[in-house]
Amino acid sequence: MEILVIGSGGREHALCWALSGSPLCDTLYCAPGNAGVSAVAECVDVGAEDLDGLMVFVAAKKIDFVVVGPEGPLVLGLIDRLNEAGVKCFGPTAAAAQLEGSKSFTKELCAKYDIPTGAYKRFSDVAEATAYINEKGAPIVVKADGLAAGKGVTVAKSIEEAVAAVDDALVSGRFGDAGASIIVEEFLAGEELSVFAICDGENALMLPSAQDHKAVFDGDKGPNTGGMGAYSPAPVMTGVLAATIEEKIVRRTVAAMKAEGTPFTGVLFAGLMITDNGPQLIEFNVRFGDPECQVLMMRLKSDLLSALVAAADQELKDFDLRWDDQTALTVVLAANGYPESYDKGTEICNVDEADAMFNTKVFHAGTARGKTGALQAIGGRVLNITALGESVTDAQKRAYEAVDAVEWADGFCRRDIGWRAVAREQG
């Protein structure tokens, strides 16, 4: 098969790495890809959201199967375009992608189909939102309704912080159209968990759990990011909890989407809070998490391509995947200043040495080759140093040994990825 992966991040490098080993894969392309992806796929100079350019490339290369990594092209309707052209693809239609593209759509679906989530209200008026926040008190959560690259959520510890987040979205227009309306939601206390399922419109194939770290600094301090690290499996996940999540959240959502006439095909990513009242949905995403995808691909022992094709063909019912019992942990190396402004074009050395370390893989995100062939940072999140270990403690130790092998004066990382699980393991 001629395969095209859409995207340029660490998630897409991990997907390309996994897909490249499939016996079904003859040629693998990635649009636009990055410096790391180029080792396993042919990178194509077409942007992930350039739908016209992508359709031209698909036709020219007679692509058999398209895998869409990021949410942007999904919400814009790339899958709809591919379906119209008769090209097999993996991902939800624009209508189904509203699960991520509109938080109010998801909240209304949860209310209608009894999917457990926090109480909320939607606002586009500053005064009304402020009055609601004053009535409810803090802590409270303020979210941009649309896509904001993982940065549109404020967990406000004070009323003042919540009101400032409202002003950011509705007055300052920080998130553009994505923040033209907001969701104000009850604060859920507990432990966060990421759960993934590959869906074919009717069936859901559950994948292992993962836990990510959104805050930029150690100790979960600082603003939220797209994710600074992750590990899988998450020790908080028990057999009983997994069954509850599958029944009350994942399968209930898949059935709800089918009933609404917008069947969901693709990766359903449930961001959950495990509370004293059981699992509660924080948000849905309609694609693999980044960096959670990297730890999942590190543990996958089966053929990913076969599973994605089965989902596209609505044939997931009896499908299964095998996973390594070891723990995978990834540490994100980011450019100094991220998630705010940061320098581009800084040089990174010794990445190949880190990649060659035992049970370690370096997935590239914001990287490119300079004119001399040197590896350069061109994004905020730049490298994902990923390792396997017998425990979270072991995987963490191995990952940070590889992190320390990389020479990049202009980058930083969190030094505590996996801290909850390590604390559990060490009693």
Predicted segments with their positions:
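Solvent-exposed alpha-helices and their adjacent loops that cap or buttress functional pockets
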Residues: 21, 36-38, 90, 112-114, ...
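ATP-binding N-terminal substructure of ATP-dependent carboxylate-amine bond-forming enzymes
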Residues: 1-95
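Generic C-terminus detector
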Residues: 50, 367-372, 376-427
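Active-site nucleotide/adenylate-binding loops and adjacent lid/helix of ATP-dependent enzymes
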Residues: 4-5, 99-181, 235-252
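Internal nucleotide-binding/catalytic subdomain
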Residues: 156-293
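Short, conserved charged micro-motifs
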Residues: 53, 129, 161-164, 339-342, ...
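Active-site "cap" helix and flanking loop/linker of ATP-utilizing ligase/carboxylase catalytic domains
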Residues: 246-268, 285-357, 370
